[in-house]
Amino acid sequence: MQALQKKQKTWVLLLLGALLGLAACLCLYGTAPLDPANDAWIWYGYDETDIHQHYAGWLGFRNSSWQFPLAQADALAYPAAEGVNISFTDSLPWVSVLFKLLSPVLPAQFQWFGLYELACFVLQGMAAALVLGLFLYELLPLAAGTALFAFSPIMIERAFRHVALSSHYIVLFALYAYLRGRREQRCFMPVFWLLAALDVGITPYFLPMVAIFALLLAVENALHTRRLPASCGLFFGTCAAGYAAGVVL
């Protein structure tokens, strides 16, 4: 790993993390939840009903007319004419909007929660590998450490029960941007802005964590480089990106 060029190492880490995340998901849950036409596991697979709420929100949103904010579902919350925003059903607005755009070519029965959970495991592994790659240089320790994140008990406890809250990759990518930004004295503004906007459309629960990393990096950057405008742009831009996503959704 030490002999690899920086860009090569990044791709190796991403591939390693993706494969371990994929292996963890398939090992734990198999392939049944990945079938978009199979929603039996949603209705009967768990004793926790949150996933029912998420799925019902998606079904109502899919059968609603387009309006603004984008995540508003007028097929829900009768008799309210404007319906309700699917943020309140934790139906991952960004993902729901994406699949609603594709709805005309999708089958009548379509659940994407299994596919999103698979993506969570893959992204969790990728983010973990990047974080560990800042400190470890041998393949075996990197793989072992990444596997611990891929099989994280906290992740497993949330997976397929409260799908939005298993998006731990958001926090890990924010941690990576903070650690690398601190090491290289860079702000990584687009990364934090993107994470904030993404997070609001997945679950705002992780937004304070992303904002804290942005604030820490902004303060350290201001102290060490004296580039106050960039530091302000990092933190306040992160907050603004989250707010803008909230307005749109």
What positions do the PLM features span?
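Short helical patches
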Residues: 4, 69, 73-76, 219-223
